[in-house]
């Protein structure tokens, strides 16, 4: 269809009233997101929708996080694909980034569009999931201890999350704190050095973010969280260079997908001794 023949679709900002329709669209595409995940993203990010005669047929989000903005849940209904709708949604999402560097996690289908808009690969994310066989937590250093976290630890969690991801996680984590089921951390010399969170997500639970100084710390935290939900379906999204994949496979969390990390500019870098071993979500980073 030529540009002159294309229908005049309506593009506008997403509102809370759009969330159920956006969720229904993702269900049609067999995406696992629950209504609550859509509502969270609508709270912490700027969303866009496209309609055809009042019917919601596409979405996209921009989530500002300091000097960066993550773009996610770029969806176009199957019967409307190939008409440039995804490209227009991406243009709106990029405009919402302002001066921030845009980053995203690209599916195989979406990668060519993002590459054409100036995005370049800088890594890969592996999606692991399944009914876990909770492993025995590995030993920590003698001067470290693992403990449940409370509201008093939230400032330190945000500090670590910012350093580990290179993003400003203040708004994202403050929203997550209200829905998290379990949050555990590793303390050394009276200071929080690492933490991980478990919450409802998709078909069961999700572990993330995981912020730690080493794979050993990350494994310990994940093992402790898995022990809290021994019969649950669990998902975790990890950088491919995290060193966790073989251990997760042994624990029953099989790799089911890989997506490309892409940036339109210099990608974020971890600061100091910690790094991010598991994402919040692929849409948020």
Where are these regions (language model features)?
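Intrinsically disordered, low-complexity, positively biased terminal segments
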Residues: 1-5, 15, 20, 51-52, ...
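Ligand-binding pocket scaffold of soluble enzyme catalytic domains
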Residues: 11-14, 19-20, 24, 33, ...
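A short helix-loop-beta-strand connector motif used in the catalytic cores of GNAT acetyltransferases and
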Residues: 34-58, 70, 124, 175-185, ...
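A conserved beta-turn-beta hairpin within the catalytic core of GNAT-like acetyltransferases
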Residues: 62-72, 80-81, 200-207
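Conserved active-site tyrosine of GNAT-family acetyltransferases
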Residues: 114-119, 248
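Surface-exposed beta-loop interaction hotspot
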Residues: 122, 127-161
């Amino acid at each position: 269809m030529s540009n002159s023949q294309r229908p005049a679709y309506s593009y506008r900002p997403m509102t809370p009233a759009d969330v159920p329709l956006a969720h229904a669209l993702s269900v049609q595409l067999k995406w696992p997101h629950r209504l609550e995940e859509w509502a969270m993203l609508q709270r912490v990010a700027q969303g866009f929708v496209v309609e055809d005669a009042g019917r919601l047929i596409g979405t996209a989000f921009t989530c500002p996080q300091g000097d960066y903005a993550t773009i996610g849940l770029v969806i176009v209904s199957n019967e409307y694909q190939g008409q440039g709708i995804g490209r227009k949604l991406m243009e709106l999402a990029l405009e919402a980034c302002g001066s921030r560097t845009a980053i995203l996690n690209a599916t195989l289908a979406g990668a060519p569009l993002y590459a054409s808009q100036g995005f370049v690969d800088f890594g890969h994310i592996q999606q692991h999931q399944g009914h876990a066989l909770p492993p025995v937590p590995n030993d920590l250093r003698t001067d470290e201890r693992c403990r449940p976290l409370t509201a008093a630890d939230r400032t330190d969690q945000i500090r670590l999350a910012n350093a580990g991801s290179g993003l400003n996680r203040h708004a994202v984590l403050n929203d997550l704190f209200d829905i998290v089921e379990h949050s555990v951390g590793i303390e050394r010399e009276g200071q929080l050095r690492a933490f991980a969170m478990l919450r409802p997500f998709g078909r069961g639970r999700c572990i993330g973010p995981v912020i730690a100084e080493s794979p050993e710390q990350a494994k310990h935290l994940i093992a402790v969280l898995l022990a809290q939900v021994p019969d649950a379906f669990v998902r975790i999204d990890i950088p491919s260079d995290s060193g966790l994949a073989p251990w997760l496979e042994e624990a029953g969390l099989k790799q089911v997908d890989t997506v490309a990390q892409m940036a339109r500019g210099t990608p974020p870098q971890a600061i100091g001794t910690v790094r991010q071993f598991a994402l919040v979500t692929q849409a948020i980073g």
